[in-house]
A protein has these predicted regions:
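Long, terminal "pre-/pro-" and other extracytoplasmic accessory regions
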Residues: 2-6, 20-175
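Bacterial N-terminal signal peptides
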Residues: 10-20
């Protein structure tokens, strides 16, 4: 009887652990995971295309998302191009009017590190977060790329993380 318990208890513990962990890894990728696919598509669209924004409106609280949207701008064509990447594949592309034109330097921290820093500085959420990476100037000490994170429990504020240094910048009221 004792030998059955010795086998059964670790087995049940393993099953419980797997059930608890599986939602955290279900369908989530980091922002940088799909960036290569998006960039290749953007360069086919316009050779001078530069990354200007990354966004997910349905991110997970671990900094991953099922789908990321990448916005590129062509200074020569004066147009923008949106590339949606889902499950490491291009899901949809669309030429759009330019809204952002400042290029995001390729040397930025990934979404999971940005989310971890935001949580360290008080961001709370149940399961969902909107994450945006773009260049900001107004209201910052210096122009640069920032992660702007709003969770499903954001209480009227977003959390800004400097995407180059990985440091918390501030909480900002949503207007």
């Amino acid at each position: 009887m004792k030998s059955k318990r010795r086998i059964l208890f670790p087995l049940l513990t393993l099953i419980a652990l797997l059930l608890c962990l599986s939602p955290a890894f279900a369908g989530g990728e980091t922002a940088k995971t799909g960036l290569g696919h998006a960039q290749a598509s953007a360069v086919k669209w316009q050779a001078d295309a530069v990354l200007v924004q990354i966004i997910t409106v349905s991110g997970n609280m671990d900094g991953t998302a099922e789908k990321w949207s990448f916005l590129f701008h062509s200074p020569q064509a004066k147009k923008s191009y949106k590339v949606d990447v889902k499950n490491s594949k291009i899901d949809q592309t669309l030429e759009v009017s330019p809204s952002f034109t400042d290029a995001v330097d390729g040397d930025f921290m990934d979404s999971i590190q940005a989310m971890a820093e935001a949580k360290k500085k008080g961001l709370k959420g149940k399961s969902r977060a909107m994450m945006t990476l773009h260049v900001m100037l107004q209201g910052t000490k210096s122009q640069g790329a920032y992660w702007n994170i709003v969770s499903d429990q954001a209480e009227g504020r977003s959390t800004l993380i400097n995407a180059k240094t990985g440091k918390f910048f501030r909480h900002q009221a949503l207007k």
